[in-house]
Amino acid sequence: MAKKLYIKTHGCQMNEYDSSRMADVLRESHGLELTSDPEQAEVLLLNTCSVREKAQEKVFSQLGRWRQLKQSRPELVIGVGGCVASQEGETIRVRAPYVDLVFGPQTIHRLPAMLTQAKASSQPVVDLSFPEIEKFDKLPEPRAEGPTAFVSVMEGCSKYCSFCVVPYTRGEEISRPFDDVIAEIVGLAEQGVREITLLGQNVNAYRGSIGEGDTADLALLIHYVASIEGIERIRFTTSHPVEFSDSLIQAFAEVPALVSHLHLPVQSGSDRMLSLMKRGHTVLEYKAKLRKLRQVRPDISISSDFIVGLPGETEADFQATLALVDEVGFDHSFSFIYSPRPGTPAASLPDCTPIALKKERLAILQGRLRALEIAISRGMVDTVQQVLVERPSKKDPTMLAGRTANNRVVNFSASQDMVGQFVNIRITEALPNSLRGIVLDAKRRCA
């Protein structure tokens, strides 16, 4: 019987990608197969996020639950990776001394050697180095887990927004070579993948080397990905407004496979707050980019991220954010109360805003965003949407689920052998977090 590996993932899509690569590398080196039951595993890995304080505390809550498993099975190996590992380092073992492995986002390719060392020596192993692109050079070919896949094209961020810990935990921006990205996607397409999501902390800063000192930007990469046989949908995330270029907007005009959905975090509708956040752009510049984009893709869905309660935020600043939300008409978006991250410039700003007021503002903002999202969903009822059938529905395994081009989950009744096909679905109902529909026909079979 194959030995088992359990991975718990917190945070962003980049972490989901990293977790899949952890599974790939340990499957190849140690014959470990993924399990959904931690009690059946001999290795437990926690891939962490440190963007917000609550996410960080979730790490230690999870480790506390795993401690009981370690006490009953001392040979069990527990590892902590991701951004909390990078930020906290040895402190993790101070709070949870039963942890065997601590590794950063850039060292997951070293997991086989770390695991072997920990088992042989019964001593903890910590590797928080930043070996840049080496991570991708040493990882095995990815295994497709369905008709959609994430592909990391760059890591890190060099923007140093005042509130953000990512540059300190993921490092500076490093782009993968163009040919390496294309080769990975070709391999996934050969395994039946039909939709690719290109990932990066600041993905539109991608500048992949293509030989003789030349580089390819994200727009050029998208054009080439669209030409790969079998790839019929392309998404990318997460974007920074500063580098959302005219060439990328032109890609939306020229590449039909690039979906009509964009996640473009703005964080605030106030120029004063954007300056305090060190975002590098104004509200007017942000809106100008969206205006250009909508000229070439009138139906595009725009989602975003928002922070309320950054130290110094006034009522006028908050009202400016609400005004931007109404003007743009954002689709499903994420919003949070500012959480000070150690070592970031914003953490040292004086904060005189009561937490009760921050919570009130967040509730108002989320209510406004939710109303827009519901209106968009209801507007899709009685329309026909092309959906890539991804998997059985999470809520009802007798149904199937897939996503529309604008990133809506649709649940519908159909035969299981339709997974991997594009189908036309008439939307019949808008539910709080998904849509329901009926299949009209299969557009094409995905081999």
UniProtKB/Swiss-Prot annotation:
Its cofactor is [4Fe-4S] cluster. It is an enzyme of class 2 (transferase). CDD domains: Radical_SAM. Keywords: 4Fe-4S, Cytoplasm, Iron, Iron-sulfur, Metal-binding, S-adenosyl-L-methionine, Transferase, tRNA processing. GO terms for cellular component: cytosol. Monomer. This is tRNA-2-methylthio-N(6)-dimethylallyladenosine synthase. It comes from Nitrosococcus oceani (strain ATCC 19707 / BCRC 17464 / JCM 30415 / NCIMB 11848 / C-107). The gene is miaB.
